[in-house]
């Protein structure tokens, strides 16, 4: 899909068992060929670690992991960060984004298992970049089959993301 301001390449996946080798080779090839024509390339991968071990993600400047504010989700993000390091993907920086928070009260305070997990991640080089608040407008876009590009500029989720992109100088 080509549009004003961005182009979109979607990689489908087959359902059920089977080898993804050919699909991953195609994806790698497209990315290597097309990436040079863009100032920024954003890869939105399915949750999980498979795309890293399949090495479809190379030459990463910034690795962002989005997780809900639970110990389990944050540990998974930490594991992904660890695998990226073991596979020598060498992202310039790695950051965690907490998603769908209802407010500051959703972030457990010091002394909780969640806070301890965040401290471990920070020590391992995975810093907390920011939080995306729960945003009813995002939910409504999904229910009305609209894209997030149709959100109003003052949508809380968009404002939070814009602040994080500023922190990253993007």
Please give the residue ranges for each predicted region:
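Residue-level preference for the first positions of well-ordered beta-strands
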Residues: 8, 40-42, 147-148
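A generic structural signal for short coil/turn motifs at secondary-structure boundaries
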Residues: 17-20, 105-106, 151
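C-terminal alpha-helix
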Residues: 160-170
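Conserved catalytic-core segment of NTP-binding enzymes
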Residues: 22-131, 140
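C-terminal boundary of histidine-terminating zinc-finger modules
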Residues: 142-158
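Gly/Ser/Thr-rich helix-start
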Residues: 13, 49, 146
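P-loop/Walker-type NTP enzyme "switch/lid" segment
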Residues: 1-32, 143
């Amino acid at each position: 899909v080509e549009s004003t301001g961005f182009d979109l390449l979607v990689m489908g996946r087959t359902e059920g068992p089977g080898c993804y080798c050919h699909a991953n080779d195609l994806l790698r090839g497209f990315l290597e060929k097309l990436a040079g024509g863009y100032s920024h390339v954003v890869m939105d991968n399915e949750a999980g670690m498979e795309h890293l071990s399949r090495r479809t993600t190379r030459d990463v400047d910034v690795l962002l992991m989005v997780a809900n504010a639970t110990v389990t989700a944050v540990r998974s993000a930490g594991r992904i960060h660890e695998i990226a390091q073991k596979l020598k993907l060498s992202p310039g920086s790695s950051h965690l984004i907490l998603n769908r928070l209802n407010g500051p009260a959703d972030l457990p305070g010091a002394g909780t298992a969640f806070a301890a997990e965040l401290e471990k991640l920070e020590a391992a080089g995975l810093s907390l970049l920011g939080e995306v608040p729960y945003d009813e407008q995002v939910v409504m876009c999904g229910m009305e089959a609209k894209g997030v590009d149709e959100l109003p500029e003052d949508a809380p989720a968009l404002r939070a993301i814009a602040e994080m992109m500023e922190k990253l100088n993007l």
